Amino acid sequence: MGYRKLTEVELSNKSVLLRLDLNAPIENGFVTNKERIYRSIPTITHIINKDCSLILMSHLGRPEENNEFQPKYSLKPVVKVLEEILDREIPLYSLEELEKLNQKPTISILENSRFYVGEKDNDVGLSNRLSDLADIFVMDAFATSHRAHASTTGVIRFSKEACAGLLLDEELTALTKVKKNADHSIAILGGAKISTLSLIHISEPTRRTV
């Protein structure tokens, strides 16, 4: 599979829009599982160490797509965790606020991408607005890379440069190795839904490994 890697892109003095998967579970305003956030850190630190401005972007949950702020689905709890890990302040902006900034901070984050009308429909207008936020688009949200949304695929069409982040590259490399070295059919199951267990039991008589 051919794609451009983050390590192959010149980042110095550029602005970067980084699509992550920060869709972490939240209860009473606190993140209860930080794994996805921690897995995003290597790509974030790689970029901010290159003397450039960085905008983080992610979805959270399934809010109504109506261009309005919905507190239940705000990325604020996620931002708090990121600030603790990176030991720096990370301002949270709406798309409109980011578009009005004359000079963007070293690092900032766009509020929940699913707040905006056109995200799930891969709207051309929204995709274009997102691409205008930065010089380079970096896709590092492996868990949502199968979705043709404005913030995952649409933005790539209009970006000056686009590449795969460190996590996405790691996952794709692992999948390629499995596929290349397999001598029989392979089924890869993902997710944490109990309903998938029945499928595993059904396939048990014919499988070699789960």
Language model region names:
Residues 1-203, 207:
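Active-site loop-to-helix "anion-binding N-cap" substructures in soluble metabolic enzymes
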